[in-house]
Regions:
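Mature catalytic core of soluble alpha/beta enzymes
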Residues: 2-16, 22-376
């Protein structure tokens, strides 16, 4: 498969680690580790999408590494922003306005990711937006550096950087025999960084499910899906990082079964614009960086694509609006749990978690509970 040589610098920092899941085997190998009653434990590792992946599963037989690589390639060829030949790169570079940019979407990747992106955009009230790329560039959150950004500049870019109206349209292949995109401004670009890796994790898990494997942990770039149980017939144990700028400290461990877990954070990427220090989380509804104290948002949902997108939306919404949004989705029957870690007094952090998740957290570094009256 084609690996991405250059990591996506605009990718929101992932604050997630897999506790006890990484095994020191060579890249791309399939290796058994001690057996359980359900079979051997197999581990595949490799590089893809500018990061690394680990697939760990319990089975009598190993699944070929090429099956995972083929799955990764299906997404990569469509949505890798660093691959000039990808469908995404070709569309973003297109200057055609109003005319259809047609492509096969033979694996249905675009149809799936577009549907999820539209849904989360709607559910979050616009906090999740896959057209935010030009605004990220404006603020210097990509490769470019920007010292000054004015409201006039923001308003100008927002005319062609919002996921609504006639700015951009997608026609899925199910209704057209082939998929098609069109944009009303040549500067409009799409950016699926906050959903594509989660979607890929779901697809890799499906590779195992299609072969009868039901106990697995699949991780790509910090996005994780856990199905069934581990080799000890226990839920998979996933560790969450402490949101610190340098070094690494594990904050907590969470047992996870039959759920996906994704974390978004902004604490390792900052820029100085207009004399102010901003994190690299931008609110697409205003076109400006967020200023609240939410440092990381960990979200659990059945599908990794949704957990990935939900976590990004929470980072935009902030601690209080994010809590209300999660509670609203739960009230509507969504299977979603969340953990937020916020700035506290001095060097301290505070946290908020949904009750079910909080009851399962194993704290490695204790935190005080978040008190909104002290910060907002």
């Amino acid at each position: 498969m084609t690996s991405v040589a250059k990591p996506s610098l605009d990718r929101i920092t992932k604050a997630l680690a897999v506790a006890g899941a990484f095994v020191a085997f060579g890249c791309g190998e399939s290796n058994p580790v001690p057996s359980s009653s359900a079979g051997r434990v197999w581990v595949h590792q490799g590089e893809a999408q500018g990061t690394t992946y680990t697939v760990k599963y319990v089975s009598q037989d190993s699944v070929s590494q090429t099956a995972f690589e083929a799955c990764l390639e299906e997404v990569d060829v469509e949505m890798n922003a660093w691959r000039p030949s990808s469908t995404l790169s070709q569309f973003n570079g297109s200057t055609e306005v109003g005319t259809a940019f047609s492509f096969a979407d033979s694996a249905g990747v675009w149809e799936d990711v577009w549907r999820i992106s539209e849904e989360v955009h709607r559910l979050s009230g616009g906090a999740f937006d896959v057209t935010v790329g030009p605004l990220m560039k404006l603020w210097g959150f990509r490769m470019e550096r920007r010292d000054v950004v004015t409201p006039t500049m923001v308003d100008s870019v927002r005319q062609f950087a919002h996921f609504a109206g006639d700015v951009i349209r997608f026609v899925p292949k199910s209704r057209a025999g082939g998929a098609a995109l069109s944009k009303s401004d040549p500067r409009t670009e799409l950016d699926f960084n906050a959903v594509a890796q989660g979607y890929t994790v779901d697809a890799m898990a499906q590779v195992l499910l299609d072969r009868g494997v039901t106990n697995m942990m699949v991780e790509l770039g910090g996005e994780v899906k856990c199905l069934g149980l581990n080799q000890h017939s226990q839920p998979w144990r996933i560790a969450i990082d402490r949101p610190q700028e340098e070094g690494r400290t594990l904050q907590a461990v969470l047992p996870v079964a039959d759920m996906s877990i994704c974390t978004s954070g902004n604490y390792r990427k900052v820029s100085v614009v207009n004399g102010q220090r901003f994190s690299h989380t931008l609110d697409p509804r205003t076109g400006a960086p967020v200023t609240h104290g939410l440092l990381s948002a960990t979200v659990l949902a059945p599908e990794a694509a949704y957990a990935d997108a939900f976590a990004t939306a929470c980072m935009v919404l902030g601690p209080e609006a994010g809590q209300r949004w999660i509670a609203q989705m739960q009230a509507q029957g969504e299977e979603v749990e969340a953990l937020f870690i916020m700035d506290g007094a001095g060097e301290a952090f505070t946290y908020w978690a949904t009750p079910s998740l909080e009851a399962q957290l194993e704290w490695l570094e204790p935190l005080d509970k978040y008190d909104p009256t002290l910060v907002e």
